[in-house]
Curated annotation (Swiss-Prot):
PANTHER family in alphabetical order: HISTIDINE BIOSYNTHESIS BIFUNCTIONAL PROTEIN (PTHR42945), HISTIDINE BIOSYNTHESIS BIFUNCTIONAL PROTEIN HIS7 (PTHR42945:SF1)
Highest classification ranks of the organism: Archaea, Thermoproteota, Thermoprotei, Desulfurococcales, Desulfurococcaceae
Subcellular location: Cytoplasm
Name of the protein described by the UniProt record: Phosphoribosyl-ATP pyrophosphatase
Major site of localization recorded for this protein: cytoplasm
């Protein structure tokens, strides 16, 4: 399941580095970190709204937007996707059998 997310991460990183003409990711980079953060916030709100009142396919669509914009934001902040996965794994190990937060 996470193989595609790893591939997407690599594509996002490449587009950030190369900034190809016509790339949406490159456009976000050009507009800067505050823009990327706002886009992530907007997409998060859209997911919340969809979760509460829209059909299932809308929730899936908005969730994909949130994941993409999260990855772009992380990349712009210099946080590697593998670090986030590692943190989730750490939490899972720390909480296994203890009730946890997940």
């Amino acid at each position: 399941m996470s193989d595609f997310l790893s591939e997407l991460w690599l594509v996002i990183k490449k587009r950030i580095e190369e900034k190809p003409q016509g790339s949406y990711t490159a456009e976000i980079v050009k507009r800067g970190l505050p823009f990327a953060a706002r886009k992530f916030g907007e997409e998060s709100v859209e997911l919340i709204v969809a979760s509460l009142s829209e059909p299932r396919d809308s929730v899936i669509y908005e969730a994909a937007d949130v994941i993409y914009h999260l990855m772009v934001l992380l990349a712009l902040r210099g946080v590697d996707w593998a670090e986030v996965i590692k943190e989730l794994e750490r939490r899972s190990r720390a909480k296994s059998g203890a009730g946890g937060n997940s």
